[in-house]
C-alpha cells in the first residue's frame, strides 16, 4: 500500500511519477492539491498486473486555486489473470476559475482472463474551466500487430514496442537507469509469443 499526498503552492510545478512493478496485490492512492494560483501538477503512472494479482490505483488531482493546471497520465498492462483498476478523479473546486484538469488513461490487456478497468471522474464546481478525460482499454489491435509483423517484427516484438510507446512518457521522468531497465525486463517477461 502506498499513499502520497502533495500540495503545490504559488507558481510551483510538481510532477509525481509512480511505476508499480510489484508482483502482488497493491493499492496506491495519489492526491495532488493545487492550493495557490498558478500552480501546476502532473501525475504519471505505469502499472503491470499479472498472474492473479489485483492492482488498484486512485489518482486525485484537485484544483483549489484559480488559473491552476492538473494533468494525469495513466498506463497499465494486464496479463494472465491479473486485474488492474484505475480511478482517475479530476476535481475543480469552487473558486478555481480559469483552471485546467485533464486526464488520459490507456490499459492494454494481453490475455483473455486479464481485466483492466478505468473509471474517470470529473467533479466541477466552477465555470470558465477546461476539463476532460480520455480512456482506452482493450487488447492491442491485431491489424497493428499484423502491420508491424509485415515490417519484419515478431508478434512479441510488436507488442513490446507498442507497450514501450505508452510507457515511454512515464520512463522519461525516471532518472534511475536501473529502474528503467527493470521495467524493460518485466515487459520482456510478460509479453508472450503467440
Regions of interest found by a model, annotated:
Residues 1-146, 150-153, 169, 174, ...:
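Conserved beta-strand/loop scaffold segments within soluble protein domains that form the structured core
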